[in-house]
């Protein structure tokens, strides 16, 4: 027995609206990722021991911009880390507290942890923020692009080295 309330045209309209909304949500999500660096020529760097001793940009990063990136949820730092950010109510507890980072690690060690943490620990859940090769399950829009730019890496390093106990 056919359903008397069934109207195919209404169903198609709902499907179209749902599809449009999904597209808008996806577009909004992509726009909300300011940390996603634009396609750029990746700067070369040398790893010495457990560090990248030299700046990726050749200049020191900006401490204020680095702090802003760390506490910004879309850059993902405070989703896993906690730290001296009293204005942030919800901080992560999956990774080390960032307080005292500048006492525990050198500038070069912090830089390598941001660029490619998996080089130090293959089982890490921390993303490689500046590595683009050898990664698995990378979305088509992100292939060949670092999560953070070299400048953003240097800004975050500049901030983290100020966190001393």
Regions found by a protein language model. Give the residues of each.
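Extracytoplasmic/secreted proteins, especially bacterial periplasmic and envelope-associated proteins
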Residues: 61, 65-68, 97, 105, ...
């Amino acid at each position: 027995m056919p359903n008397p309330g069934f109207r195919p045209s209404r169903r198609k309209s709902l499907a179209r609206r749902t599809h449009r909304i999904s597209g808008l949500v996806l577009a909004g999500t992509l726009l909300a990722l300011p940390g996603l660096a634009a396609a750029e020529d990746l700067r070369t760097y040398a790893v010495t021991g457990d560090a990248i001793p030299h700046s990726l940009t050749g200049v020191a990063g900006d401490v204020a911009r680095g702090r802003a990136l760390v506490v910004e949820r879309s850059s993902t730092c405070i989703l896993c880390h906690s730290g001296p950010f009293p204005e942030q109510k919800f901080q992560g507890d999956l990774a080390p507290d960032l307080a005292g980072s500048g006492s525990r690690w050198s500038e070069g060690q912090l830089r390598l942890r941001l660029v490619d943490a998996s080089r130090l620990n293959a089982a890490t859940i921390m993303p490689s923020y500046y590595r683009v090769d050898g990664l698995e399950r990378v979305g088509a829009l992100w292939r060949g692009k670092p999560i953070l730019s070299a400048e953003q890496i240097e800004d975050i390093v500049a901030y983290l080295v100020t966190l001393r106990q």
